[in-house]
């Protein structure tokens, strides 16, 4: 009987500790986790609705270019997501560029692509026989990669400016 009481006491103590630790962890959240979100940018989607995007999450803006994308749209890549919008490339670049510094580069097909410099984590040379023949470099970010015509040196210089 004493062994059973002892086991129950230990179990009760463990439960109390677990509840205390969970409560303490909830109270000591990182300030960014409890801070209110900044201003959202609103874009008109292809279906006529609107989509709000946190500008801090945007990393790439370009016009659609592949056969599996809606023609004539603008692509905003953000936080591992993608939204296609009706607005012009110039309008989107102006709206985002007013909040986040954008750098303009050239896609292998010749179209412009705008990258948020702060999102760039690295630049590598294009891989022969794997990258597009017109690509000279690959811009790397946490969210993805973008092949461009500029050299790695030119990209590195542009990103630090």
What are these regions (language model features)?
Residues 2-161:
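Eukaryotic intrinsically disordered, low-complexity regulatory linkers and tails enriched in Ser/Thr/Pro
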């Amino acid at each position: 009987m004493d062994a059973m009481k002892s086991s129950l006491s230990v179990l009760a103590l463990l439960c109390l500790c677990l509840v205390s630790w969970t409560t303490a962890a909830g109270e000591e959240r990182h300030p960014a986790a409890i801070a209110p979100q900044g201003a959202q940018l609103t874009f008109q989607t292809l279906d006529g609705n609107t989509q709000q995007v946190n500008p801090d999450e945007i990393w790439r803006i370009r016009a659609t270019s592949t056969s599996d994308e809606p023609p004539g749209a603008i692509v905003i890549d953000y936080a591992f997501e993608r939204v296609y919008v009706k607005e012009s490339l110039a309008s989107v670049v102006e709206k985002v560029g007013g909040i986040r510094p954008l750098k303009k580069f050239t896609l292998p097909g010749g179209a412009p692509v705008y990258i948020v410099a702060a999102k760039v984590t690295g630049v590598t040379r294009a891989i022969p026989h794997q990258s597009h023949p017109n690509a000279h470099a690959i811009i790397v970010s946490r969210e993805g990669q973008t092949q461009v015509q500029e050299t790695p040196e030119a990209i590195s210089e542009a990103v630090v400016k």
